[in-house]
Amino acid sequence: MYDIEELEVGMSASYSQTITDADIKQFAGISGDRNPVHLDEEYASQSRYGKRIAHGMNSASFFSALFGTKLPGKGCVYVSQSLKFRMPVYIN
């Protein structure tokens, strides 16, 4: 973790997490987004993705984990982001 004064251009940090079936179901419950492309294997198999995918905002929420625990770390709250989802995130 870093204090804001310690941040420099070019610093980096990483965060990795495997999204499981349980994560998908929990995120659907929390967000209210029960789109069958996330929850229904048969429906998703007929979609452009070919199988179930994670919610885009579930993946985007990992920015909060990265900023709040790694760079800069404790106490950091980010207030804006702009996203373009280029590739689906599949389960596991």
Label every model-predicted segment.
Residues 1-80:
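Hot-dog-fold acyl-thioester-processing enzymes
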Residues 80-92:
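Active-site beta-strand->loop segment that positions catalytic residues and contacts the acyl thioester
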